[in-house]
């Protein structure tokens, strides 16, 4: 089994669950989140197939960190890879932590939030310092001259912050 490449379906599945109260949608979102970073990466496996044609040349540099699939989400401690995808995934993780009252997932969300806002965020509140693959780089690498800080990443960060406040049941909150 695999999981979606771009973490957005998990958010939609949680919303669908909240509207229908059909747990199968919530369970599928949890399945995708829990599977990420474990076992084979089917996107890398596809590239190994004979005759594979790369549609996007920039993806010659694709790695599992780009898609937050370098390790299971519960073991991730630093914001990595594509900044929008990351914050969408973190938002879904916070939603699932709230719905399942999953303490381990809640702690993973806190760890990722703390790393991002204390070590990988500009003073303006933007995230994602590299224009190359629109991604996070390393702690405190926040260049002024090549700052990327895509608007979508900042909006996704706001989504994550709102969900962190909901998860922690703190209003007003530090998130």
Pin down the residues of each PLM region.
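Glycan-recognition and catalytic cores of secretory/periplasmic carbohydrate-active enzymes
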Residues: 1-175
């Amino acid at each position: 089994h695999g999981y979606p490449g771009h973490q957005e379906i998990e958010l939609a599945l949680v919303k669908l669950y909240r509207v229908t109260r059909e747990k199968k949608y919530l369970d599928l979102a949890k399945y995708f989140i829990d599977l990420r970073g474990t076992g084979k990466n089917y996107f890398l496996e596809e590239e190994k197939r004979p005759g594979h044609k790369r549609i996007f040349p920039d993806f010659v540099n694709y790695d599992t960190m780009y898609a937050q699939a370098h390790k299971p989400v519960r073991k991730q401690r630093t914001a990595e890879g594509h900044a929008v995808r990351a914050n969408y995934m973190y938002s879904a993780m916070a939603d699932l932590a709230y719905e399942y009252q999953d303490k381990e997932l809640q702690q993973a969300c806190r760890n990722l939030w703390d790393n991002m806002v204390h070590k990988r965020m500009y003073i303006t509140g933007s995230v994602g310092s590299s224009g190359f693959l629109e991604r996070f780089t390393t702690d405190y690498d926040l260049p002024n001259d090549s700052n990327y800080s895509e608007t979508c990443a900042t909006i996704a960060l706001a989504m994550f912050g709102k969900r962190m406040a909901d998860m922690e049941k703190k209003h007003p909150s530090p998130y």
